[in-house]
Design a protein with these regions (language model features):
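Short glycine-rich anion-binding loops that position phosphate/pyrophosphate groups of nucleotides
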Residues: 17, 98-101, 173-175, 298
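Phosphate-binding site of ATP-dependent enzymes
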Residues: 27-28, 155-156, 163-167, 177-265, ...
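Redox-cofactor binding/interface segments in oxidoreductases and associated redox assembly factors
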Residues: 13, 95-96, 170, 209
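Conserved N-proximal alpha/beta basic substrate-recognition cap immediately N-terminal to
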Residues: 19-21, 25-38, 43-151
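Anion (oxyanion) recognition and catalysis
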Residues: 36, 117, 162-163, 274
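Short, Lys/Arg-enriched N-terminal segments with co-localized hydrophobic residues
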Residues: 1-8
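ATP-dependent carboxylate activation and anion-phosphoryl transfer catalytic cores
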Residues: 9, 14-15, 21-24, 240-241, ...
Length: 327
């Protein structure tokens, strides 16, 4: 991809602790590496280190020197300067990469980011977009692309849905990495206890979807960057006997070209996501069905970059450079 020559920028990454990164597969690491190679200055903070002082949104942020990992388990890939209190408007771009769960604390972070945006900061993805797009519920806007789905707090509704379809998946609305996802069949003796646990006795909203048999071939992560679709999807193939393809639970990632159906889905979603201030989204597709729209911290860059001659991180940093603010 062409590198856009740009004046060096100050880029703040709001991300989990850097020493916890698995550098051989971490997407935020790939973003930082690309930005550092272009001469941008990197800073890091945690979502919990955002605050409001004298009306300004500030972060306790450390400037990061990117050294690069020598091997897969090298945690000394960066050097962090002592943290200092910096207003978010002092950065050309702020990249929000904190992992879900999207709990109240996460919600407050996005509200502070929205306040910073009102003060002139450029945040990717925007705080508003992250609030608007619950990763599970967002698919309900696109029924033409989804499997039969219900959202409910009532176990009786789920039982009725199960009786209709015979084989379903149930999942919480705030999970990540495959947590809390169950497959239920009518013959399952544990239906009652699974629903009680998951729905906390009719007090927690969940989603149920008809089981999609194509999951045995994995689900696909399709990346959309600033309205442009990355031409390769990352198929996540479940381990034998496992319902979930998530890489976090041992799925295997295989990069592959997009199918015709993938293109049909992305043609509809890409311009809408861009219009909503979503610079980076990860669509999850199983077979022909859209199952999730990830906007909080989509991954998959490195697997695609290693398997195909396509630099996803360069495409992403190009998009950040195009959309950043002059400070």
């Amino acid at each position: 991809l062409p590198r856009h020559p740009k004046a060096p920028m100050n880029i703040l990454f709001i991300a989990d602790p850097l020493a916890s990164f698995k550098t051989y597969k971490d997407t935020t690491y790939a973003m930082m590496r690309e930005a550092a190679q272009r001469g941008h200055t990197l800073f890091h903070t945690l979502a919990a280190q955002l605050s409001v002082q004298n009306g300004s949104v500030v972060a306790q942020a450390s400037q990061i020197q990117f050294l690069g990992a020598k091997d897969d388990h090298d945690h000394a890939w960066f050097q962090a300067a002592p943290a200092q209190s910096l207003a978010l408007t002092q950065f050309n771009a702020i990249i929000m990469r904190s992992d879900p769960p999207f709990n109240m604390q996460y919600l407050y972070s996005t509200q502070l980011l929205t306040l910073a945006e009102q003060q002139g900061a450029r945040v990717f993805n925007s705080g508003q977009a992250m609030r608007d797009y619950n990763e599970k519920l967002a698919i309900l806007n696109y029924p033409q692309f989804t499997a039969p789905t219900i959202v409910t707090t009532r176990a009786a509704d789920v039982r009725q849905f199960l009786a209709k379809h015979g084989d379903i998946i149930v999942k919480p609305l705030d999970g990540m990495g495959g947590m809390g996802i169950f497959r239920l069949r009518e013959s399952d003796p544990n239906i009652g206890s699974i629903l009680e646990t998951l729905m906390q006795l009719d007090s927690r909203t969940i989603m149920a979807q008809r089981y999609i048999p194509a999951i045995v071939h994995g689900d696909k992560r399709i990346l959309i960057i600033d309205g442009e679709v990355v031409p390769y999807a990352l198929a996540r193939i479940p381990q034998n006997g496992e319902t979930r393809g998530n890489l976090a639970v041992g799925g295997r990632g295989v990069a592959q070209a997009l199918s015709e159906r993938d293109r049909e889905i992305t043609q509809t979603l890409a311009p809408q996501l861009k219009a909503r201030g979503i610079l980076l989204a990860g669509l999850d597709v199983i077979g022909d069905c859209l199952t999730e729209i990830n906007v909080t911290s989509p991954t998959g860059f490195q697997e695609i970059m290693k398997q195909k001659d396509f630099d996803v991180a360069a495409q992403f940093v190009n998009a950040v450079e195009r959309n950043a603010q002059a400070v």
